[in-house]
Amino acid sequence: MILRIAIAIFSAVLLLACTDSAPTEHEVSIAYLKSLCSGNHYRIVDDYIIRGVVVATDWLGETNKSAVVVDESGGLEFAIDSRDISRRLPVYSRISIFCNGLMLSRVGGKIELGAPPTGDFPLGSINDEMFDRYIRIEGVEENFTAPTKLFSEISIGDIGNILRFDNLHIAEADGEVRWCDTLDGEVVTTYRTLIDKENNTLPLRTLSTCDYALERMPENEISAIGIIDYADDRYFLRIVNKMIIQ
């Protein structure tokens, strides 16, 4: 009898210890996480986890020290400063981001994720020393397909997400126009204009750091896959992974 009581007490203590020490983690959607940032910034203090597919990094210079992760609810850009981002965070890898301790901030009209700021910029970067604490590679998404939309169907929920657009022409393309202009011998970030089959337009933004900045733009009809951004009261597209389909 005494032995049974002792075993019961030991089991209860062990269960209590496990309950107290094990953190409660909650998997949430990207859309839910972004909804927490109702102001200019939000410090995450709960054990939220988001899981998704990496669809863009700065490996081709198309983004600036950032990556984009998407799930079925939408997309989220997060600030990352790594010496070898293409190795540590391959495109189309499936990842988990452990968000407790990170920060959501409104940057240029959209919500981004990153580390708490250390300077004047509203968001810090997840650096190599922080990487393993916050990001875990779960595998590879071998059959990722970006959703297809028309320009007229873009909505606020698409900001940060990857989308595909078909039957496009580039308004400025004449066989000689490059993705980026030069000014005083320096390549500069440039906006062009995409036109779809309904004759609607969408600005296309290409960073000066892009690997193909000085390549000629296609004159013929294309499909383009990129990230929807928002700034200055307008949507625009950033092509990722050089996904220009002719």
Could you describe each region identified by the protein language model?
Residues C18-Q246:
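OB-fold nucleic-acid-binding modules
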Residues M1-L16:
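Sec-dependent bacterial lipoprotein signal peptides
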